[in-house]
């Protein structure tokens, strides 16, 4: 529910007020999205759009980035957005998982270049976007996106 962001954790420990925690998480989410556009002015709109699509991608059946949804322009390819993906991933704003075609080591050799799944960098941010203050929905998490993000964070941290 709180995720791992220090301000959200401190608010939970000190106040235990879900509304304050969600306000902090909303502010951080907005800060990440706005911050991306300040550092890369040439790509800011596409970066913000990709970032804003992450939660809906996780709730989608395919759960991966669908390039045509970024600008709603047919004919665009994954490579058209490589700089934007790189910015979000390298800045730590988003976590990346690439699809692999075979389970042969090293995995990077069989990764699909155009099959990418992006995650927010904190489970609290996602639970805020999807469920706000509905604790029951968080605990039930029927589509398992919170658990999936938590597992991703755990694997990437170790």
Residue ranges and their predicted role:
Residues 2-158:
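Accessory nucleic acid-recognition modules appended to NTPase machines
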